[in-house]
Structure formats: structure tokens, C-alpha cells
């Protein structure tokens, strides 16, 4: 009901700036409900972060890039290479590593909604920080190169890819929203994770990428897979220096 109400109001407003529209919907929701969905999910994520796993440890024992339990600004530096796993990880996959390697959960016990909630909580600690994603290790450079290849690739029955929408057709509309300049001025990397008020969903960039693939009728990469991590790194690196205005964000 909430999503339908907000979407109805948005559509009635016609062709408006997406960011200004999001601000209006956010204010409307805050005035009617008294709290934002993002805040509720962050609180849930905080509880999960401090929950003990089968090993008796909480996520405070995990290193998200700046040392055990250090969260301030950590998400703004991801994806990055981690020595303990010998691979590049983003926030989502690092949370899974934490839950399985440190907390003792079995892979099949890791719930996606819990990963997203914890991602919202950890990301909230990077609000106001600048994006600082590096390409220092060979693993990072190799994954970035894969991300570049995937971003510019065209395939499928429609002969389209990421760059079709987000380079060639920037500013044009296929629906309500214009295609974002994800490699340039829009700094789209700083827009996720986010609450999508149009469909009442909580998404990280992994979910956003999978949805994009679905929109162009391509098979969706698996969660936490190399293709998703590669595209994330390719999107994050150009955003270096951009300030995270608000994580988790509130978007259409």
C-alpha cells in the first residue's frame, strides 16, 4: 500500500527531477510515518551485526578493510582486495565472508535479507565520507578490466549492454526515470545501497546490477559473483572523491 501511494503521488506530479521527487516522497513518508524505512533497516542491521553466530562471535570480530570492527568510512573504500580471502570483495560479499568464516554460519544459512540489512547498517557509517576505491593489487586491476569489458559488451537478441543505456542514451527515458550517467556526473555509485520507494524494496548495488540485466533481457549474474563484483569495481573507481551524501539512500 505504501509503495502504491507514493508511486501514485509521484506519477501525478508528471515529469519532475528524480532527486527532487525523491526528496518530496521522503518528506511525505517521514511526516506520515514518523520514521523512514531506511532507518528501520539500519536498526535491524545493527542488531544483526551484534548478534553472535554459531562460533560465539559477532561481526565486530570481522575486518571490513580498516581493521576489526572499524566501520567508519569502510564501505566507502569497497570493493577492494582482501588478503585473508585472496580476492576482491564488495560490502555484500565481505558480509557473507564474515558470517561464514568468522561467525560460523553455513553458506546455506546466510539469508539475503540479513546481508542487505547489515550492508545498510555498515554503509550508514560512511555517510559524509569520500569514495576511495583503489586499483593497487593485480587482483583489483584484473577485476576492473573484466568490469570494463562487461560494461561495454553488447549481446543478446536486442544487441544491448550496460553502455547502451548509461552512455549512449544518458538523459533519455524508457520509462519514468532518465538513464543515469553512471561513469560520469551522476556518481551513481554513491546512490546505493538504497530504499526504493516505488516498489518498497531495499537494494544494494548487487540488486541494482541484477535488475539492469533483467531489464535488457539478459541472464542475471548470481549474487556475489565475479561479474557483479567486476562491474561494481568499474563503477566505483570513477566515483573516487565523490562524497556520500546519504547511505543508505532514498530513491525511486
Predicted regions, residues:
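Bacterial N-terminal signal peptides
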Residues: 1-9
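Hydrophobic, well-structured mid-protein blocks that either form specific transmembrane helices
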Residues: 118-125, 134-138
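Intrinsically disordered low-complexity regions specifically enriched for long asparagine
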Residues: 10-12, 47
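Solvent-exposed, charged amphipathic helical/linker segments at domain boundaries
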Residues: 129-146
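Electron-transfer interface patches adjacent to heme c in soluble/periplasmic c-type cytochromes
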Residues: 14-40, 50-64, 68-117, 124-128, ...
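An amphipathic alpha-helix/helix-turn recognition signal
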Residues: 40-41, 142
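Generic detector of short alpha-helix boundary/capping microenvironments
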Residues: 2-3, 33, 135
Amino acid at each position: 500500500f505504501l509503495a502504491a501511494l507514493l508511486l501514485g503521488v509521484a506519477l501525478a506530479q508528471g515529469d519532475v527531477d528524480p532527486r527532487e521527487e525523491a526528496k518530496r516522497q521522503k518528506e511525505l513518508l517521514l511526516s506520515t510515518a514518523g520514521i523512514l524505512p531506511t532507518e528501520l533497516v539500519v536498526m535491524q542491521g545493527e542488531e544483526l551485526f551484534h548478534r553472535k553466530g554459531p562460533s560465539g562471535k559477532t561481526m565486530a570480530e570481522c575486518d571490513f578493510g580498516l581493521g576489526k570492527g572499524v566501520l567508519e568510512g569502510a564501505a566507502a573504500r569497497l570493493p577492494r582486495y582482501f588478503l585473508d580471502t585472496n580476492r576482491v570483495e564488495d560490502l555484500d560479499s565481505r558480509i557473507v565472508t564474515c558470517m561464514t568464516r568468522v561467525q560460523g554460519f553455513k553458506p546455506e544459512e546466510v539469508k539475503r535479507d540479513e546481508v542487505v540489512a547489515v550492508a545498510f547498517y555498515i554503509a550508514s557509517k560512511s555517510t559524509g565520507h569520500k569514495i576511495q576505491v583503489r586499483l593497487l593489487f593485480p587482483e583489483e586491476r584484473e577485476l576492473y578490466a573484466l568490469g570494463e569489458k562487461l560494461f561495454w559488451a553488447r549481446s543478446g537478441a536486442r544487441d544491448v549492454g550496460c553502455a547502451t543505456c548509461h552512455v549512449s542514451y544518458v538523459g533519455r527515458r524508457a520509462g519514468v526515470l532518465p538513464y543515469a550517467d553512471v561513469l560520469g556526473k551522476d556518481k551513481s555509485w554513491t546512490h546505493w545501497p538504497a530504499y526504493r520507494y516505488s516498489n518498497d524494496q531495499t537494494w544494494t548495488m548487487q540488486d541494482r546490477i541484477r535488475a539492469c540485466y533483467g531489464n535488457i533481457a539478459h541472464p542475471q549474474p548470481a549474487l556475489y559473483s565475479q561479474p557483479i563484483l567486476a562491474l561494481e569495481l568499474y563503477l566505483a573507481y570513477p566515483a573516487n572523491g565523490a562524497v556520500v551524501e546519504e547511505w543508505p539512500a532514498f530513491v525511486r
